[in-house]
């Protein structure tokens, strides 16, 4: 199976759970203690790590790095600072999948009872950050109807 790093994994459902069912080895990272407790209860096969993704240094590389519905809750500078962290956890050929908004901007949304912050840089800024940190932009699908309206990026680490 593949080695998967799920950043901002929350409860592990549905993403980490899906990879585990496939037979992949998943490391789930979340900064919230309550989410790590829930992750361990719901998907015990996941290697659960309580950590702030913005300061992550696991000393390992992964085939797939995910920051799905997590990365876009960070501010602009924190998002920029994530690209060296993505690269540090990638090997040649690793895939990076992350969600942003469709264009530059900030918004507030609701998750359950909580208000949550969303922030996105312009697509060209993400393309520049990917290239600068050794990733090849494979595609960007803004507000993709096949992905529940999420704006999703896929990139491959070339190390170049």
Task: Annotate the PLM regions.
Residues 73-74:
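A short His-aromatic
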Residues 80-92:
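A short glycine-rich, Lys/Arg-flanked "PGG" loop and its adjoining helix->strand segment in the class I
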Residues 101-117:
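Short, glycine-/aromatic-enriched active-site segment of Class I SAM-dependent methyltransferases
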